[in-house]
Amino acid sequence: MRTITIVGAGEAGTQTALALQELGYGVTLVSDRSAGQIRSGSITSSQCVFSGALDVQREVHVDPAQRAAVGIGSLQLNVSGTPSPIAWTAPLDRPALSIDQRVKCAQWIEEFVARGGDFRIEKVTVRMLEDFAAHSDLVLVCTGKGELGQIFARDRRRSSFDRPQRVTAVTYVRRPEIGGTADDGDANLAGEGPQGTLRFSLVPGVGEFFTFPGLTVSGPCQMMVFEGVPGGPMDVWDTVQSSEEHLEASKRLLKEHFPHEAEAFADAELTDEGAVLRGRLTPTVREAVGILPNGAAVLGLADAVVLNDPLTGQGSNNATLAAHYAAESIRRRGDQPFDEAWMRETFDEFWRGWAQWSTGWTTSLLRPLRGFQLDLLAAAQEHPVLASSIANGFDDPRTVFPWWQDEDEARGMLEWAAHQERNGFDVRDFRSALGQFATGVTVVTTRSADGSRVGMTANSFTSVSMDPPLVLWCPSKRAPSLGDFEASTHFAINILASDQHVLSRQFATPAEDKFAGVRCAEGVSGVPLIEGAVATFQCRTVARHDAGDHVVYIGQVEEYTNRGGEPLVFHGGSYHATVRHPEFAR
């Protein structure tokens, strides 16, 4: 049995431990606190876990107290301090949840131990890491606290800041009429707004406030997060000493800068003495491989190497996805050594598929909003499909690129939003209805005129004819690489295997090099063939048909491979694996 030591029992450490334990590895989880100490201690974050990360948690049967938690089904945005105030509400495609890390991390540790896991309580030093590395096949560091944070060098290329961009304060409260038991989960915690809403208020140059329902150690609560520009009028926390002073400062900031929220929290009370947190952090990306004094290498995960400001609520999502990417990479490694090259490849895969987008999204909001970005927020008041796209960017940040960062792309997005609403349908509901049709997932590839490899994720693929052998797929007219497919004579359909969901995400991003880290062979006319796909079809383009906002490509199959295996399935906005129907399982 291969052995893995995980240092740090936060969201990333505990989820990785549970995932690897289920895969049959010998796992040691090391924390500086027991489950009981975590549960009775102070809050550690302002976590809000969106649906994509929740899907990952459920894969390892991590489902703590979710029945008692209030789902977050929409995002409400308010922008003041601008010539024209902005206010709108948009639904999330799927609900988010916020469960106090004191609740879930303590429960996950207990679950890990109940399954037979080796849990140790120690304050880990670099010297101890050397000992762990000598007696384990792999060491994962999931905390950047103390001297452990110094073993991972700052990545200057990927780090945008060298100092804190916000002064952060977090407050968990309950109101007297809400009470503190899980049975009160249907109570309206959101003042004038609808229950189950993440309310995000922004004053350019001053700071932000956001609040959402959650579940803490005493039951349902409302979580309050203040993000003040350093040196500005919301930078008031240095003189605060006690929990009560913290609560009073929270209410005072609402009256002064977010008066539309003040009344809802006038009678708010702390959920417990540990329900406050304040501080400053410098958003930083670090090298994922740490080299210890004795030459041993360890792999950093989550906040240890990608530390984002809480402004966009990405921390818990980053931790969950980092755990997922790491566990998948470890599983695929089999009996091969966990060497430095593999460690870098594992992190780069996570960075390409997820972390670069969550980091870029957070960085864009930490910086002063540009004129076209304010225009997008304002236009969302008139275009619900645009508001929905912005709101769901908190769930999957790659979906807001490139139009959130590029002025020309932003204009195109505005035109698209206006056009989408002319058909009279609720675009979100129509897309959800179409999503009820389960499909496989493909990556369609070709070569550009200059010989570069081109690819995009698509599930709009189907067979057309057996004689001659024809297939079709339908790219969007807004796809950046559409011109490359128009100029090429051939393309390849690569049907992804169940364990290739990482590639599905990677090829669905606007990244410059989507093929980074992807093993490919070369097919007809040089089209890339992705290794590990359950089937590939090398096609000559025989027809293109205009079809609304998409183009229908018909290709004649010239060569194909049928490797077989379990395909990746997409349904209802998330990935699935094939399962034999129980009535036909016998």
Question: Which residues does each PLM region occupy?
Answer:
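Conserved mid-domain beta->alpha element of the FAD-binding
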Residues: 6, 279-358
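Glycine-rich FAD pyrophosphate-binding loop
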Residues: 7-9, 21-42
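Conserved N-terminal helical subregion
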Residues: 63-155
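N-terminal FAD cofactor-binding segment of flavoenzymes
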Residues: 33-79
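C-terminal helical "tail/cap" subdomain of flavin- and related membrane-associated enzymes
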Residues: 312-313, 328-422
